């Protein structure tokens, strides 16, 4: 892996992980029964689900604790292919919902371009990420280059569902062309949400590409 920040080569990238996150809730207008007024509330299910790519880099820099590059962008489900291997050579879309940052409290990474390369295995893929950012500490303020290139771990498709059987229809709705037979389902821990939110226990479901 090669990470360049401000023309420096950083050799302390401890981990680089790419995930496909399915958000299974979204705020939507609802009409209250008691007063008939319309408001918004979180709604759950296929119609309220969206897929996102998320790339995270974990870096250990002695004097730069806030350096934790993170990229988050929506997926165009209508063009998502049947097999992940077909994504090789794809440039991930950038929209007004895309978020790319230098770190938790750091500047935005602008002019972001993230491309997927070859899949080395079902759990590893080559990526190339270029961007630029504003150096808040330079005087006068400068725009500096950022780039990352190398193999990253693919952690799978992750979603939170209220019932185990919800995972398949949600995935089919969000990524309709994806061949789900190439994946195996791994269930995570249950979270008891309690009576205050009046919701069923939530299960974290992860689908990993089978070898």
Q: Language model features by range: what are they?
A:
Residues 83-153:
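Acidic, glycine-rich flexible loop segments
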Residues 1-104, 189-209:
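An ectodomain-focused feature that recognizes extracytoplasmic/extracellular
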Residues 124, 156, 160-162:
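Residues in flexible loops and secondary-structure boundaries
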């Amino acid at each position: 892996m090669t990470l360049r920040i401000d023309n420096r080569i950083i050799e302390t990238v401890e981990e680089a992980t790419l995930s496909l996150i399915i958000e299974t809730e979204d705020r939507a207008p609802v009409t209250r029964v008691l007063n008939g007024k319309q408001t918004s509330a979180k709604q759950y299910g296929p119609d309220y689900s969206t897929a996102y790519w998320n790339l995270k880099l974990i870096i250990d820099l002695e004097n730069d604790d806030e350096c934790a590059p993170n990229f988050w962008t929506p997926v165009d489900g209508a063009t998502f292919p049947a097999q992940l291997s077909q994504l090789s050579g794809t440039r991930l879309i950038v929209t007004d919902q895309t978020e790319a940052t230098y770190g938790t409290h750091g500047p935005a990474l602008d002019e972001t371009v993230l491309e997927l390369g070859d899949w080395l295995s079902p759990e590893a893929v080559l990526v190339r990420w270029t961007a630029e950012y504003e150096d808040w500490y330079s005087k006068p303020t400068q725009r500096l280059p950022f780039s990352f290139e190398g193999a990253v771990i693919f952690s799978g498709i992750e979603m939170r569902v209220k019932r185990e059987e919800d995972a398949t229809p949600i995935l089919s709705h969000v990524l309709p062309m994806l061949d789900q037979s190439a994946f195996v389902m791994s269930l995570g821990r249950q979270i008891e949400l309690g009576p205050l939110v009046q919701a069923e226990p939530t299960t974290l479901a992860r689908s990993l590409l089978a070898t």
